[in-house]
């Protein structure tokens, strides 16, 4: 009777296809105690056609079942009990419920894993080696693609995870040691390194960059992250350089290279692993704010007779090529060699479309916006919307495609130009100079474009025509205005070996005689290859070309002045002759009248 009733309920359960918990409680008629409990969970009973067979499989040493054995079928949300006449024991029910709930909790992770397995592999079969290797390969390739494509996002999540587990100091020390080892400069990251999700950048706060002999020899790099002392040094450094006090540079040791000690308030960086694989550096975008410090060049020595082209650097794999660079609020004190006075250099705002280590000077001249001061002299570099007029370049389609910028420097002291430079600037020892330079850059196709690849291929296949070579040059239309200049004759003649010594005295006399204002117009053309590896006006050869053009302009002015003087003399002689001729004619006209009057008397 009981088996038939249970069979009907089992059939109903199978049709509903709901998971049930079935508990069998067997009580011996002799001892009235619980002998065995088995909990089974299943959604189908097709493998167990009859309950006696099910009980026989799950209960060992069962013996003869009593007719008073209660059999309880429980669903997760409800309880159904069937009995042959005895009243159910409430203690057994409560115990069963607690055991079943704990069993469900323990089974939850297995359910989740089973669902993940079904979602990933689309099957319920046991995992094989092929499944595991395929899953691992998919996981590895996806992470590699993520690192290459979204490098900044990957590092942002990594830094965010490390910051959340209170590893900021360890992370800053590790990054500082890594950059110190790769660059030779001592880096200190005092504050937290956090991702900027809105801008897609990683923010570094309170950075110190130092290049001194002890850091290059590895002495200062052994303990570069002393957090307890760095905060005091950082605040003292900013306070000292924000004020008008003189910087303390006694600790700087001697070395034939540029030494510096800089503090950066904030740096926003984005990375690109794909650019790193191409040898362009891992940094894709860089924004700096609040730079203070000292740049010491007092111990640099060079041979004046050497060629400036020897100082150009060679390209190395891994040199940075930043796609976007911004700089705000920079103020450093520059110390020059040979006892030259120290002076401040400030940059208020700078935005560059790209900044390459190999083309540093060229990219600075090609800036979108650059404003600042050099020894309290304002300077600006900005793009021109319209093409400026130039009498040295022909109007054409290729000229219209060139990019034009303007460099303007007001009231620069002449001692910045006459140090180590031969020519007219080397003769002037007093005064100030205003520069207005219109720079024309050759057009360049965008990076990774088909046009650039096609032009490069055509340049290799055929030779460029001569009339097109002018558009591969960088052109400078220079307008120099000298205010209150004073020149002296050079002592050594080897400084003026490239000019005629006979013109030195007339030029110096012309400069000293015109002390109020002297305008100079000249044009300089430099091949684009001269800026490959150049970092300054000196090693690019622009300063030497401008000095030579200024001399030629002075020579033309002196020649024109001499021509004007001779012309004035000729005009004066002609005027004097005409005046004397008129006097003689007048005397001749008066002579007959005088003789007639005397005869009448």
Curated annotation (Swiss-Prot):
Spans within the Mitochondrial intermembrane topological domain: 156-601
Transmembrane segments: 135-155
Keywords linked to the UniProt accession: Membrane, Mitochondrion, Mitochondrion inner membrane, Transit peptide, Transmembrane, Transmembrane helix
Cell location: Mitochondrion inner membrane
GO biological process: mitochondrion inheritance; mitochondrion organization
Domain of life: Eukaryota
Record flagged with keyword Transmembrane helix: yes
Membrane topology, from the record: Single-pass membrane protein
Transit peptide: 1-66
One GO CC term on file: mitochondrion
Topology, Mitochondrial matrix side: 67-134
Job of this protein: Involved in the organization of the mitochondrial membranes and the global structure of the mitochondria. Also required for mitochondrial distribution and mobility as well as for the maintenance of mitochondrial DNA nucleoids structures.
PANTHER family: MITOCHONDRIAL DISTRIBUTION AND MORPHOLOGY PROTEIN 31
Family: Belongs to the MDM31/MDM32 family.
Protein name stated in the entry: Mitochondrial distribution and morphology protein 31
Organism: Schizosaccharomyces pombe (strain 972 / ATCC 24843) (Fission yeast)
Species classification: Eukaryota, Fungi, Dikarya, Ascomycota, Taphrinomycotina
